[in-house]
Amino acid sequence: MLVMACDLVVAADNAAFCDNTIDLGVCGTEFFNHPYDFGSRKAKELLFTAGWLSAQEAAATGFVNRVVPLAELEASTLNMASVIAAKPRFALKMAKEAINAAHDAMGRPQAMSTIFALHQLCHSHNMQVYGMPVSTFEIKKP
């Protein structure tokens, strides 16, 4: 999910999120933040089932910062951006670095490196088994 690479997320109340990479025969995306965003059990549930997460559920897990009515999405996002833009830039950068350092201390760089290697291994496996880097439901399992 592209949203995982975002520092802040404002979602419309009708938004839904899904990571269906397992359905494509791949064990996750190149940017893999699932355990950090959801915790291990919820990450496994979402990946193993390719289940959908409503905007409200995403907010409850901390995956999105705010949920607003669709009609207010742009205004709410611009408001948040202007509040942040008015802050001292260096202090913002240092706050972001501190938060990222905390994640790094929890092993995120090693996890990212490992998942990228496993992701590529899945592509290699699919090339050998299916003749393409991703699989589809129509392909019969060997």
Regions found by a protein language model. Give the residues of each.
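C-terminal alpha-helix plus adjacent terminal tail
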Residues: 54-55, 75, 79-82, 86-142
